[in-house]
Amino acid sequence: DMGVPILGTSADSVDAAEDRERFDEVLEKCEIDRPRGATVFTVDEALEVANKLGYPVLVRPSYVLGGAGMEIALNDGDIKKFMKIINRQFQEHPILIDKYLSGKEVEVDAVCDENGVLIPGVMEHVERAGVHSGDSISVYPPQKIKPEIKQVICDYTQRLAKALHVIGLINIQFIVYEDEVYVIEVNPRSSRTIPYISKVTD
């Protein structure tokens, strides 16, 4: 807003990755699926969406780091409890409600510029999907991901990095469910796994 240029990925691209409606447009353009879901602001909206999707659902605030505030809701009581907690901790943040897929969570860090996208490796989470990323363990190389699924993940990473015009680092979290790949979220920035993946792929 102050007219000062930002090095690396633009603020607009960061917003496109964080804003639900804009990110859905990016995914549609890239022909990539994500778990069904919606953005809500109130408990009543959350209950309506959760019952429409069917339990379990993933509840999390948007525009936060590392999956903070993320919870898996199994019923209406969980929704009411988690919405109260999230609204108290993350005031004025939209809340995302997604269908919970009990698949294998996979993570990718990549380095991008106008000439291409470098993917050092694909990391597989040990814990079930939905565990706070700061509390999870990942392994490299992935142990239970089929080569063809890994190729799809790399292809999706390329598409998303280019569509968002990322300059620098990007972190993408995927879920592999019944041999289908879904995007959970995209963070056009450095992640906690950068030091680890830079060492093990050196």
PLM regions: where:
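ATP-dependent carboxylate activation and anion-phosphoryl transfer catalytic cores
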Residues: 1-8, 15, 21-22, 26-30, ...
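Short acidic active-site motifs
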Residues: 45
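RNase H-like polynucleotidyl transferase catalytic core
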Residues: 8-13, 36-39
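Short acidic-hydrophobic, aromatic-tinged amphipathic segments that line or gate anion-handling sites
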Residues: 37-42, 72-75
